């Protein structure tokens, strides 16, 4: 403890703060990268005039409350007041739209990534640029405002994301980490900067030429992990620490997005690695050796914090339907007066699923509480069906629902692995699906036909990943790449428990997916038949 105290007192600790959609979290780490103090502030987006937003006041109240709780935690644990830090890093939800005029006034309320209001712009830009531009990307928001002839557009001097805005206010620097920038505008992984040819194509659009600004001048400057991104100003220090104890002059890392910090937190920034986060929603991110051959609307292209290309498959639904069925079995046990721990119920049901027929026995389930763009559905209805000759038993039932939780992810990833022939050495699994040891892991390995590792220490998540990126900036030696720093100095060679795909499981999941795809028409009919 005295060691930690001296690390804080001498200003050697590093701080990461991440703005999630419901929680802002600060993690302070020591020289071994382990968390030593944390603080959190809950917040909720608001729907104002049909736009999902957070006010600027909410941002600053949130970050100062979060910081003061972290500082209080450090004081209570170690009896020390934080005055200096080795480095700070800010991360947040990617994408969205924060445009400012030349006097630095916000021109319209912050439009977050949740707003699906840019369909026309996203489709047109995808065609013009020959690159998939999802609706939540900043450039789609800007172009939609142009198509809508919104009067604020002519006044834009700078536009940025949430993390980019906070970093700018703390340092005065209009910069951004490459991973975060890749959610604003496409990145060229060779130059680790915005794609020059695509900038030219955007600037040449007739509707864009009507405005006085050049797209290159209003985007943030791109930096890669390890570069210095400015220092905390006196004004910035006061905004972060309202008690006035924190000194100015602290180095800041390039602000990053939640995708990049998640890659760092799971040690999956190296080429041919990836990570799968499976909870209420599910996504897979795979670091590519080279650019993809074709444009796929199912795949979002972003980058690691170092600028390597990453393909991402994001699905809205994962464990909610599974959890509902497990809850039903809990109720059944209570009818018999049994008080069984939920973890035991999950354990028994999930492990029993491993004894099932490899294809699920002819049962099929859709776990869709909401729409799923990967299979072309704007809405979803949870649904379970079977053929009359299907082998209906508990093991097949549970295996079918485990398959269903990853079915849309598999359809998206099959494009990556089967059509694009992308190779992956290891996928790191994290999230609720992997809580029951070995089960979610083996189902994911079957879905992806790839080795899946689960860390014994499920990482501390995004804010910790951001703190690690800030530590990398101040600790790295010349020429030390981020992936080496993570493997050697942060994860200390820990590879986690790796599970290879079982060929019979892979074949079984492929057979299940064929049934699932054939039944998508029934799911579509169900959405129509049961309107909300």
Feature-to-residue mapping (PLM):
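N-terminal glycine/serine-rich phosphate-binding loop of ATP-dependent small-molecule kinases
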Residues: 1-108, 123, 155, 216, ...
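Electropositive nucleic-acid engagement tracts
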Residues: 208-211, 215-217
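Active-site core segments that coordinate phosphate-bearing ligands/cofactors
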Residues: 2-11, 15-16, 82, 120-176, ...
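Short beta-strand-loop/turn "lid" adjacent to the catalytic site in phosphate-handling enzymes
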Residues: 75-112, 132-134, 167-179, 183-188, ...
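Generic structural signal for well-ordered secondary structure
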Residues: 52, 56, 60-63, 90, ...
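Carbohydrate-associated surface elements
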Residues: 115
